[in-house]
Regions:
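Single conserved hydrophobic/aromatic residue that forms the stacking wall/gate
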Residues: 1-13
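Short internal beta-strands
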Residues: 50-58, 138
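Glycine-rich, charge-decorated loop segments at or immediately adjacent to ligand/cofactor-binding or catalytic sites
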Residues: 61-66, 136-158
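Glycine-rich oxoanion-binding loops at beta->alpha junctions
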Residues: 70-100, 112
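Glycine/threonine-rich flexible loop motifs
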Residues: 109-121
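Glycine-rich, aromatic-lined ligand/substrate-binding cores of catalytic
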Residues: 201-278
Length: 368
């Protein structure tokens, strides 16, 4: 077993690239270097940090999914927190962009197309390209970096939960993805930004990396992070995936599902104030006892969604249009309605996976 992966930062504050620059950071509560936050380390070393951009869930990481997080100041340091969304088309405003020279990105991602941190990074890269600002990504391991799975996004479904033509599980770090965005000219108007990536050390795509800090309120443990690519689709259905319980993304159920011995009741909790099926007894399945190895072996497993779909017998009332935004293509819902199995559906996107693996290869910083 090799040494555990570490950040290749060396002493980030000794980097020439940050000298005498006005610095903005894109980070949140996961931006820890050892037991200190990047923001505090930069300030302690007398760097001129002028702004913080914070993603969904806010800078301290405690807001609900999609909740409006207003611009403010960080109470601890007094550094202004700027909105990612105060300008046109979900980008920061020109006034925000003129405040700094270089953007430092340090945030823990989980490597899935519908997990929004990478889309925020892409919007910032686009704004930095437009206003000629440098970007420095302090790379972090991807806990789902050991495989690629799912259909490539059909760009007619581009949205906040799907920003790039990549599979659901892209298997890349944010640094690799940033390089690919530049190299494939994926930013609007084919812009590219001035990008530097500081890679991790002792890391390959087969390194199993356990996150020291939960990346958002409803991904509290590794089991939730491994099951997320299979259970997230319940967000587009009436079925609860365990928000408001101790096992978010690790269970699924509904008051009208029958024939199950397991049940749970969603409650209002921090990070899930008003979860689906709030206060109702839901019958269904607990996946949290499945071994990590079993989850990895299955990759994206649509059998959970298919099981609930068949059990509830709601036909067209089961899926909302959000389903296509999450899965990224129109054939999956059709095949589920036609009675196809999870395996048959997965076979349909196998070519996408192989194609993407070839396409991403030039941008990989770590051995596959």
């Amino acid at each position: 077993r090799d040494r555990s992966p570490s950040r290749g930062l060396g002493d980030v504050y000794k980097r020439q690239i940050l000298k005498n620059k006005r610095i903005a950071i894109f980070s949140n509560h996961t931006g820890m270097i050892g037991d200190k936050h990047l923001l505090d380390i930069l300030l302690e070393n007398k760097f001129n940090v002028v702004a913080i951009f914070s993603p969904e869930h806010g800078f301290r990481g405690d807001a609900d999914a999609g909740e409006h997080v207003s611009s403010s100041v960080d109470k601890k340091t007094g550094v202004p927190i700027l909105s990612l969304y105060d300008g046109k088309s979900g980008k920061p405003s020109e006034a925000s962009m003129r405040k700094f020279d270089i953007l430092v990105v340090d945030i823990q991602d989980v490597g899935l197309r519908f997990y929004t941190y990478y889309a925020s990074m892409c919007r910032l890269m686009d704004a930095c390209a437009e206003y000629n600002r440098k970007v420095l990504i302090l790379d972090r391991p991807n806990p789902n970096g050991h495989y690629v799975d799912g259909p490539i996004l059909d760009m007619k479904y581009k949205s906040g939960v799907g920003w790039l033509p990549i599979p659901v599980v892209h298997g890349m770090t944010l640094g690799e993805l940033g390089l690919m965005v530049n190299g494939e000219r994926w930013l609007p108007a084919s812009r590219t930004c001035d990008l530097t990536v500081i890679p991790c050390k002792n890391y390959t795509h087969q390194t199993l990396y356990k996150l020291p800090i939960p990346p958002s309120p409803n991904l509290p443990n590794m089991k939730s992070i491994y099951l997320y690519p299979s259970t997230c689709y319940f967000e587009a259905t009436p079925v609860s995936l365990g928000r408001g319980t101790d096992l978010p993304f690790q269970v699924y159920g509904h008051p009208n599902m029958t024939g199950y011995s397991y049940s749970f009741t969603p409650r209002s909790v921090p990070g899930a104030k008003n979860p689906p099926q709030l206060g109702k007894l839901c019958h269904g399945v607990n996946l949290s006892n499945m071994s990590d190895e079993e989850i990895w072996k299955r990759g994206i497993d649509l059998s959970y969604v298919i099981d609930a779909y068949r059990n509830l017998n709601m036909d067209d009332h089961f899926f909302r249009s959000f389903f296509e935004l999450l899965i990224g293509t129109d054939y999956v819902r059709k095949m589920i309605k036609e009675g196809k199995s999870a395996e048959e559906i997965k076979a349909r996107w196998k070519d996408d996976v192989e194609k993407f693996k070839v396409q991403r290869k030039p941008y990989l910083l770590y051995e596959e």
